[in-house]
Regions:
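Active-site nucleotide/adenylate-binding loops and adjacent lid/helix of ATP-dependent enzymes
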Residues: 2-11, 18-115, 157-160
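Short acidic loop-to-beta-strand element that houses the catalytic metal-binding Asp/Glu
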Residues: 119, 179-182
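Short secondary-structure junctions
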Residues: 38, 62, 169-175
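C-terminal active-site "lid" helix and adjoining low-complexity regulatory extension at the edge
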Residues: 171-174, 183-229
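Generic enzyme active-site microenvironment
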Residues: 15, 67, 178, 191-193
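Phosphate-binding site of ATP-dependent enzymes
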Residues: 77-172, 190
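Hydrophobic residues on conserved beta-strands that form the core of alpha/beta folds
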Residues: 40, 105, 176-178, 191
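Short glycine-enriched loops at secondary-structure junctions
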Residues: 20-23, 133-135, 182-184
Length: 229
């Protein structure tokens, strides 16, 4: 962050805005989105681990499977899918992993296994393209690094509407943004994560996406530098 602050205070233009970078570093931005009206995957937030937290989360979420992950992490690092039994078996490991480390506990959304995770990509709040990632058999993680299958999609109109609503809640306007969603048990699309810090944009999945990105970047620079079009 010190380097980013130095860049922001220099003549260089930091993209996205430093305020957005700071805000999105920790997954607690999901709480802010929820307060602003976004539907997120239900989340319980904790600053440190204690023996009863995980077991109580099963009851709180009304589920037999939960996901626990650090508030600051990437690529599903230190992310666990837990049943009650596995939570007991891994009690010592979980205590060590999340000792004095903020984390979030969410219900496992089973649709992720078959329906996958939907990602919408925006340049200056305008939707560019969309993808779907489905975990490999026997896994729950949707990252390519873990073997997930990535495809380009034409997003469902309801997903497009939900995505536009979520992105409108981000302030200031990001030059680029990726919004990840999962379909909840009731069919609604729920926000899993926002990616505002150099995310994988999968420009290769849409032949027009690189051009859209370049045009959006040009517009962003001119707007923030006061350059006439």
């Amino acid at each position: 962050m010190a380097l980013l602050t130095e860049i922001d205070q220099s003549r260089a233009l930091l993209v996205n805005d430093l305020a957005l970078v700071r805000w999105s570093l920790a997954k607690t931005y999901l709480r802010d989105l929820q307060r602003r009206g976004a539907a997120i995957v239900p989340s319980l937030w904790h600053d440190k681990m204690s023996p009863d937290i995980i077991q109580s989360a099963f009851a709180a979420h009304g589920t037999d499977r939960v996901i626990i992950k650090p508030v600051v992490s990437t690529n599903a690092t230190n992310t666990y899918l837990l049943t009650r039994e596995r939570a007991v078996a891994l009690e010592s490991e979980l205590a060590e992993t999340f000792r004095d480390r903020p984390f979030v506990v969410q219900p496992f959304i089973a649709n992720i296994l078959t329906d996958g995770e939907y990602s919408l990509f925006y340049f200056n709040r305008t939707l560019s393209h969309a993808t779907r990632k489905v975990p490999k058999p026997g896994d729950f993680r949707v990252q390519e690094e873990h073997g997930a299958e990535l495809t380009s999609i034409e997003p469902d109109p309801a997903l497009v509407e939900t995505g536009a609503s979520v992105v409108s809640l981000i302030d200031p306007t990001p030059m680029y943004a990726r919004a990840d969603f999962v379909r909840g048990p009731d069919g609604r699309f729920l926000v899993m994560e926002l990616e505002l810090i150099e995310p994988s944009m999968y420009l290769r999945m849409d032949g027009q996406a690189p051009g859209r990105f370049a045009e959006a970047f040009d517009h962003y620079v001119k707007e923030h530098r006061g350059v006439s079009a």
